[in-house]
């Protein structure tokens, strides 16, 4: 990847085969959980931090025909992304309702949606912002409604045997930045996504905000060089890994450091290709019905 190929957005990573495969697996499990519970009728759903609609598209593809939602509420801070999401979903649902808003400020009518999904974004908020968002989601869900989210930025996402890769990549990137005379602003705080909160935090947050936790599970993805270069070029990833450095310089240095770090610390698959595994975790929770509480 050359300098002119850098794209600081998330979509280049979301377009990789690895990303689609791991998220297809997660979405299929979400659909299966709803089917197993006898609850797959989704009239209206909300997709938080929708981007261009990749996750909700996967969901619609996996749902039985009779269960496909009529109205999808897409929430994002980017007007461009919302416009593209609407175009991508055209023909799949009767109506797409775009909302330009931070997810933590979302205000939907009480008990107006059957399901809320949040793909690969919960880790960008502070703990208090997460709490506020969970509370607003619960308020918007109808009784028995579903809350589904995932993340590859929890404490358990990077097993001990993979840490050498991250350290090697960052060391190489920092060395390159110093050689180029790029200064770090030490007073810049680390991004929330660099905090890597544990799974127990999210489980407790769900319970404290009134959800019934149905399932928390992991899916392991083997990420190869191109995928690592694309996520390393994502602005928020670069800001978390090399906080304090100018964003464009940090992203460029991280991308360039992928190949040497993989060569030194990567795992080798059956075809001789190098990769590093990343653990995605997903949660399935419900807004409880009174009958569910009394029957526990």
Residue ranges and their predicted role:
Residues 131-143:
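A short glycine-rich, Lys/Arg-flanked "PGG" loop and its adjoining helix->strand segment in the class I
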Residues 44-46, 52-105:
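Class I SAM-dependent methyltransferase SAM/SAH-binding core
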Residues 1-46, 54-58, 62, 148-176:
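Conserved class I S-adenosyl-L-methionine
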Residues 108-116:
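A short acidic, Gly/Pro-enriched loop at the edge of an enzyme's catalytic core
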Residues 118-121:
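A short beta-strand submotif of the Rossmann-like class I SAM-dependent methyltransferase core
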Residues 194-209:
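Short alpha-helix
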Residues 2-9, 13, 214-270:
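C-terminal helical/coil "lid" or tail adjacent to the Rossmann-like core of SAM-dependent
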């Amino acid at each position: 990847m050359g300098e002119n190929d850098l794209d600081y957005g998330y979509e280049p990573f979301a377009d990789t085969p690895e990303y689609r495969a791991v998220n297809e697996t997660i979405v299929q499990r979400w659909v299966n959980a709803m089917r197993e519970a006898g609850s797959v009728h989704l009239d209206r759903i909300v997709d938080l931090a929708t981007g261009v609609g990749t996750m909700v598209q996967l969901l619609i593809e996996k749902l039985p025909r009779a269960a496909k939602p009529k109205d999808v509420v897409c929430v994002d801070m980017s007007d461009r992304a919302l416009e593209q999401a609407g175009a991508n979903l055209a023909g799949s649902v009767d109506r797409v309702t775009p909302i330009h808003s931070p997810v933590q400020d979302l205000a939907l009518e009480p008990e107006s949606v059957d399901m809320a999904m949040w793909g690969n974004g919960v880790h960008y908020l502070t703990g208090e912002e997460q709490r506020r968002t969970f509370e607003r989601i619960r308020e918007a869900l109808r009784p028995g409604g579903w809350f589904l989210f995932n993340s590859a930025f929890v404490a358990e996402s990077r097993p001990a045997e993979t840490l050498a890769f991250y350290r090697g990549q960052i060391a190489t990137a920092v060395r390159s930045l110093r050689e180029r005379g790029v200064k770090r602003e030490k007073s810049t705080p680390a991004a929330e996504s660099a905090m890597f909160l544990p799974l127990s935090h999210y489980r407790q947050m769900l319970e404290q905000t009134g959800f019934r936790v149905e399932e928390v599970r992991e899916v392991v993805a083997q990420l190869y060089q191109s995928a690592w270069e694309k996520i390393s070029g994502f602005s928020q990833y670069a800001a978390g890994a090399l906080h304090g450095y100018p964003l464009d310089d940090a992203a460029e240095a991280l991308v360039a450091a992928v190949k040497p770090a993989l060569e030194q610390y990567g795992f080798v698959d059956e075809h001789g290709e190098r990769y590093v595994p990343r653990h995605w975790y997903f949660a399935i929770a419900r807004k409880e019905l009174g009958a569910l509480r009394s029957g526990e």
